[in-house]
Amino acid sequence: MSIGLQYLNKKEKETVNSFVKELREKLGGNILNILLFGSKVRGDFDRDSDIDIFILAREKGDIRDAVSDIAAEYFLEYNVPLAPVVYSLFEYTKNKELGSFFFEQLEKEGIAL
């Protein structure tokens, strides 16, 4: 079992893998990185927890809406709540320069997908 993915059940793993694959197929040229983070990585989740996925894009443009639409389709089809968070490279760089707590945590716990 992959480190950091041990808290995902089989259905969640399959859903996340399919979601990431579809993102890369549909938006691949704009996607720089995809990370799993949050309670499902740390192990402090509860039965109502969603699956946090960070997506780093070259440019945000229409990608946020496309990602949200795909995540909604996966929820309807698999009943697995995905919570994608999309940042552009510019936003990511600026927030890191400012010492954003979110990005510090993301670097500590994020698992590349």
Report residues per predicted region.
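Short beta-strand->loop micro-motif that forms the acidic, two-metal-ion catalytic signature
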Residues: 52-55
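Catalytic core of pol beta-like nucleotidyltransferases
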Residues: 1-33, 41-47, 57-113
